[in-house]
Amino acid sequence: MVFYFQSILPYIPASLLTNKDSAMKHFLYSALAIFLLAGCSQKPQSDVDTPEYHFKAGMRAVESGEYNAALTSFQRSVDLDKKFAPGYCGLGLAHAHLGNVKEAKKNVDKGVSKGSKDPDVLALGARVWITLREHEKKWFKRASKLLDKALKRKENHEASLYYYGVAYLYNYDFDEAESYFRKVVGKKGTYAGKADAKWNLAQKIVRAMPGTPVGKKVALHEKITRADLAVLFAEELKISELFARMPQQNAGFQTPGQASAGGSAVNPVDSKGHWAETWINEMTKYSVLDVSPDRKFYPDEVISRAEYAMAVQRLLVVATKDPGLEIRYFGESPSRFSDVPSSHYAYNAMALCAERGIMHADMITGNFSPSGPVTGADALLIIRGIQSSLRMTF
């Protein structure tokens, strides 16, 4: 305290220091004391009121998606210790998830500056930049710089290897991501479980072979929307090219669900102005994806496995010119799925996809999970299954 007081003496006017007015002196010293105390760390109020404890609580909140609660915990950690580097990186991470880009960058820079020799802090800093990938063009460069530094501090540092894999995954270098996740799984440490899940995802995407930039982006989605599927069908399956190669349908051909292969000339009322408008209109034109009776497409709704199966069925019916495909499996006894009766509206589509190896039931339970979501990677694998079924190469 004395040191800090002495350090600011040169900036105090001499007239104030020599002032004989005791009231003025008292006011001056009181103000200085308050100022100095405000810059100091707060005192803990219990044995568990420590920076480390609050940091761990903050990280648990982050993993649970409770980012405002995380901010509170991380802030307390640095209030208790102004030099606590992990706390600042934690603040950066929570702000990044909340979209507070300026605060996220400020805190992560402060954290890695204070913890430049700690590989755990550097890895956490890299995680912040990965989270900011939608807001910062140089996110990969910044993240990899911190991870390289961490790995120099500690060779084969587990967290750094894991987040290098995550960085490559979101940079769409899936082969490189696989390599890092494989290393982490082999270490059988704290990150092994997470790495195994990401490794499986990377392997699945590699098998799906997304051939377009949009395919690579959607491949990472945990749930895809109807708009996402429209884009995938247009770009990865190349529906327009597929239909152009097909011979014209017979004049009287109709599927039970669609009037013709040409579909409706009227675009959905909710596609106009949507980011996927062009692709949505293309898919509804060919009746591959349906429009509801109120003429809406509902592009931002998450698509279910049953809905995806129905879309695949429509495509196969038109491609094969066999309307019987839409009713072939209805009423089967017993049902081939343990969770879906053969009277289900989408049962035929699900059975058709399973029969042709395009979509699969769970190998253990036999469940098809019709209301479950479709991941981006699974959506791409299904498209490859469609191509295989149609024996087409693009």
Give, region by region, the residue ranges found by the protein language model.
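N-terminal propeptides
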Residues: 43-47, 85, 101-106, 113-116, ...
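C-terminal motif of bacterial Sec signal peptides marking the signal peptidase cleavage site
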Residues: 37-39
